[in-house]
Amino acid sequence: SFIGATTLMIAHGLTSSLLFCLANTNYERVHSRTMALARGLQTLLPLAATWWLLASLTNLALPPTINLIGELSVMMAAFSWSHLTIILVGLNTLITALYSLYMLIMTQRGKYTYHINNIMPPFTRENTLMIMHLFPLILLSTNPKLIMGTMYCKYSLNKTLDCESNN
């Protein structure tokens, strides 16, 4: 559906941008793009590890994120178009989930490597940037009608009085 694709595009844009910002903060501290060299940062940078966890969970499209609402809308539209597309969409979802978990584990867990010393904590501007990415995601997750409009009422699991008055 058009609304589902729009929802997914907005959610993907915010989530991907957040993940790229986090990758850049890792690069600025480790000076390498290799994930194996950036492992173990959770013990050194706990706040950055929290940002990584929230970004990965959003990328996984876990409830109640806006990513889940967009993915479910697109999946329903694709499945109604052709029953074979559910296989492709399912594989895509599985690969995305596996890579997101792999990325989180490789960069945050484990013992940090020998070349990491004197790691600077995240700056205020970096934390502000992460909040500026997460705030719209949380806002859209708590109120999907901002994107979906009246289509949210049509596909909502819980029909509220607000939806009844609009129809």
Swiss-Prot record:
It catalyses: a ubiquinone + NADH + 5 H(+)(in) = a ubiquinol + NAD(+) + 4 H(+)(out). Keywords: Electron transport, Membrane, Mitochondrion, NAD, Respiratory chain, Translocase, Transmembrane, Transmembrane helix, Transport, Ubiquinone. It is a multi-pass membrane protein. One of its GO terms (cellular component) is mitochondrial membrane. One of its GO terms (biological process) is ATP synthesis coupled electron transport. It is found in: Mitochondrion membrane. It comes from the Eukaryota. The chain crosses the membrane at residues 2-22, 44-64, 86-106. GO terms for molecular function: NADH dehydrogenase (ubiquinone) activity; ubiquinone binding. Its EC number is 7.1.1.2. Its main location: mitochondrion. Core subunit of the mitochondrial membrane respiratory chain NADH dehydrogenase (Complex I) that is believed to belong to the minimal assembly required for catalysis. Complex I functions in the transfer of electrons from NADH to the respiratory chain. The immediate electron acceptor for the enzyme is believed to be ubiquinone. Belongs to the complex I subunit 4 family. This is NADH-ubiquinone oxidoreductase chain 4. It comes from Carlito syrichta. The lineage of its organism: Eukaryota, Metazoa, Chordata, Craniata, Vertebrata.
